[in-house]
Amino acid sequence: GKDHISDRVFKTEIFKDEDVKKSTEMPWDDNVMLRTLEISFDRACNLKCSYCNPAFSTAWVKDINTYGAYQNIQSDGRGHFLDTAPWAEPAAKKEEDNPYIQAFHQWWENGLADNLEEIRITGGEPIMHPGTWRLFDWFQQNPERGRQMRFAINSNLSPQTPKVLDKLIDKSWSVPNFE
């Protein structure tokens, strides 16, 4: 229910009550540097987990496109399996053409990376998206920056090839606080 915290998502509550209270007392136009950021670059995913839906998994989208909307499904009433969640389509097919992803990377370079305490990449499947690998590369190329940051990905660890898992293991060594 709405008053419960998922035991599947390991960090559902990220802000302390005093942080929320402080934010309500600040002027609306104050510049605020985030301490925690959860980001999804894309919904591309290779699995159709029972707790997921088309908004977060292209495998679910493919299933609905092939067989149609689910009938007589018991759900929370949000209609997740009635369509393919077209609103979740990426703004562009290639990362370099997506203005939102480009804006994120610019923000990252212009101070976010130096102030963030935690970044969590969700999906879809994060290791299927170039944006995740771009952050791993950034940590490799900037070993003096982002030392205080926790870097977590919500991965199913089921890559399409074993080489991708090997790459993840190799790249994770360059991130000081990888979870």
Task: Explain the meaning of each model-derived region.
Residues 34-44, 55-99, 114-130, 142-164, ...:
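Core AdoMet radical
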Residues 1-35, 55:
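Flexible, acidic/Gly-rich N-terminal and inter-domain linker regions that tether
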Residues 37, 104-107, 115, 135:
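Alpha-helical packing segments of well-folded alpha/beta enzyme cores
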Residues 1, 44-55:
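Local cysteine-cluster metal-coordination motifs and their immediate loop/turn environment
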Residues 11, 16, 82, 137-140:
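Compositionally biased, low-structure terminal segments
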Residues 104-105, 132-141, 164-170:
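Short, well-ordered amphipathic alpha-helices
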Residues 16-30, 96-110, 163-168:
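A Trp-anchored, charged/polar loop motif used as the substrate-binding/catalytic surface
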Residues 27, 86, 106-107, 137, ...:
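Residues in intrinsically disordered, low-complexity segments of regulatory proteins
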